[in-house]
Amino acid sequence: DWLEARGHATTQVGLKRSNLASEELERAKNGNILNRTTLSLFYATDFADQLENTIIPSLRAGFVVLADRYIYTLMARDLVRGLDEEWVRNLYSIALRPDAVFYLKLSPEKLIQRNFMKNHTLDYWESGMDLGLSMDMFDSFVQYQQRLADQFEMMRKNFDFTIVDADQSVDELNNELRSHTERVIH
């Protein structure tokens, strides 16, 4: 809304939003039986469909594309799950390099609080339960999210992430993101 009020047409993309794969991916995840490679390929298909049918056409039409998570989240998840780094990079080599990446950094402990406030439960996959880190979903969530944070820390150097402290009010966070976004757009 903020960008559109400033005259920029926008399109939003994110995980599990493609017409081709999102519903099947959600159904497959509900059974908690996917192996790491199949899960990765499902998400890669979801991304590729959005790239071809939403991202590229929107950019060609002059839109600003806003991605709520992009390939870096998918790559980090795959790497934490033990997939080969070269394979993962090749899988997502079709992706366009974004003009900016804002990494909203929050400790796993704070993240779990926000997750409970929003969803009132923990998700099997977001908790890394498939990795066998702990039989306790809470402990597994914290360990898995810490591994993701460590992976993002390693990736940010290669992909030039702008780190944003997510442990602030919604208004403060929005103001900071707007400030960073203005620098990119102008």
What spans do the regions from the language model cover?
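ATP-dependent small-molecule kinase phosphotransfer cores
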Residues: 6-96
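Structural signal for short hydrophobic segments within the conserved structured cores
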Residues: 11, 100, 162-164
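Conserved nucleotide-binding/hydrolysis micro-motifs of P-loop NTPases
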Residues: 17-19, 71-72, 106-112, 170
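NTP-dependent small-molecule kinase module
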Residues: 2, 116-186
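A glycine- and Lys/Arg-enriched "phosphate-lid" helix/loop adjacent to the NTP-binding pocket
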Residues: 74-147
